[in-house]
Amino acid sequence: MPRITAIKPQKKSNRRNIYLDGRFAFGVSTMLIVKEKLKVGDELSLEKVKKLSDKNNLEKYLDMAYRYLSYRPRSIKEMVDYLQKKKISTLLTEKILLKLKKQRYLDDLKFAYWWLDQRARFRPRGKFALTMELREKGLKNDLIKSVLTEKVSEEELSLKAARKKIKSYRRFDKKEKKKKLKSFLVRQGFGWPAVKMALEAVLDKKII
């Protein structure tokens, strides 16, 4: 059986290179070496080498997934798409998804709440537009409908969007402001009742 003849650190990485019978064989994380109690002189069967390679790949691609999640929360579909772009096998992708779900890093319900909160704070949009966005993220229709019903008030969001946008229309007269603001709110996916209320609120000052 092949024998470990050297374990050498990689440059600029918390990983080690494993040499079998004097030749480089594969790289593994320092943590995996500790877990598997690998040391120079150990004999490794081909089956053991394959298992180490599989565990190493899982750790390596999990680290990639964690980095992807570090920028912002992700939907399950977003993570699947990301892993597929990295040419990761279906079996390994399933293992990564399972681990991330168990660790609560992937949860479409939590993702939906986060997405709606971000939209409400920074870019208010109507239910139709939000529905389309969440569908693109791979969320199921029942989940989308439930979360939108619970979390979204079109009237409040349209009013918030209108108050923010009207500031950029200062140089226009009231008629032109109304035309532009109406067009903007419709493009943001708001229904007519919410649009009408927002127009009255910011232009006719019927609602403060």
PLM regions and their residue ranges:
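An alpha-helical, amphipathic repeat domain used for nucleic-acid recognition
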Residues: 1-208
